Amino acid sequence: MTRKKWSFLFTVCLVTALIGCGQKNSQVDKNNSEELNKLGQIQVISREEGSGTRDTFASLAGFNKDGADGIDKTVNTATIADSMDSVIETVNKNPSAIGYVSAGTIGIDGVKTLEINGEAVSDNKGKYPLTRSFYLAYSGTLNDVEQDFMTYVQSVGQEIVSGHYETIAKNATFLSNQSEGTIRIEGSTSMAALMKEIADAYMKINTHATIQVTATDSTKGLNSVMSGNCEMAMSSRDLKDYEKELLNYNTVAKDKIAVIVNQKNPLSDITLYMLKSI
């Protein structure tokens, strides 16, 4: 499949009148059309299959093939990145690139976020369309140290969550039971940095516990906890029906998926319709 050009995208924006692309008048439109034409072909940067961010992005943007559990319609010319950092690095270096990452990672020079349907990723009114939950999933019943950690995550740990994401509960007091044990947590790269920060803070309170956080992807993490190779899985997507039957899970944070482009790209706004088009 031939990659579309940025100038084509802008032309469609104007013709359909579905999006203003962040522009204020016809002169700006003309200038942006010229700048977009210089960018050439659009290079889509996508996460790998199994990524919770990819799964959720495809679902929310409306290009799953066969419903919520279907294969998504990510363009076959997309460059595949195996982590958020890789997406950001690629977009940073390529003026014609567009990608998507957890909004909690934004702030790196060289990339900018696009408004979606006129709503900024910083919107706190609940109107931003690419919003999801972060989950910790586990099999069976939590043991003492696992329950202690989960309680921490959903209480005092929410203060750490609030630094980058939307909390799921008000901060509450926490008194550790000082249980001993090791908790292996695997899964989403979008969640890994947050969970490492929470785990480090918890281990200062409960010095008898050891928590190991390994970033793979949501699907690998869920498969790992189902097979008994770890105690908890980080999932940045909703669990599928069969996973819900086999696992228990708790919400630990709310996140937004940001669509990012290079700073040289003149666009500031895009719609879900246009995302599907590219």
PLM ranges: what are they?
Residues 21-231, 235-278:
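Exported/periplasmic ABC-transporter solute-binding proteins
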Residues 2-25:
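Sec-dependent N-terminal signal peptides of Gram-positive bacterial secreted proteins and lipoproteins
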